[in-house]
Amino acid sequence: MSNVGTTGRIPLWIIGTLAGTLVIGLLAIFFYGSYVGLGSSL
């Protein structure tokens, strides 16, 4: 199971999944904060 087209030894789909999860999490926190009122100061 040697993936040649990967950056280092981490598969690209793992990087994509982690990046997508982080982006969705940040957007969720930002929108939640804006609804509560804490995000208005940002």
UniProtKB/Swiss-Prot annotation:
Membrane topology term: Single-pass membrane protein
GO cellular component: chloroplast thylakoid membrane; photosystem II reaction center
Any Pfam family the entry gives: PsbJ
Keywords attached to this entry: Chloroplast, Membrane, Photosynthesis, Photosystem II, Plastid, Reaction center, Thylakoid, Transmembrane, Transmembrane helix
Transmembrane segments: 10-30
Entry-linked SUPFAM superfamilies: Photosystem II reaction center protein J, PsbJ
Localisation per UniProt entry: Plastid, Chloroplast thylakoid membrane
HAMAP family: PSII_PsbJ (MF_01305)
Role, per record: One of the components of the core complex of photosystem II (PSII). PSII is a light-driven water:plastoquinone oxidoreductase that uses light energy to abstract electrons from H(2)O, generating O(2) and a proton gradient subsequently used for ATP formation. It consists of a core antenna complex that captures photons, and an electron transfer chain that converts photonic excitation into a charge separation.
Similarity comment: family membership: Belongs to the PsbJ family.
PANTHER family: PHOTOSYSTEM II REACTION CENTER PROTEIN J
Name by which UniProt lists this protein: Photosystem II reaction center protein J
Organism: Chaetosphaeridium globosum
Lineage, broadest ranks: Eukaryota, Viridiplantae, Streptophyta, Coleochaetophyceae, Coleochaetales
Gene name tied to this protein: psbJ
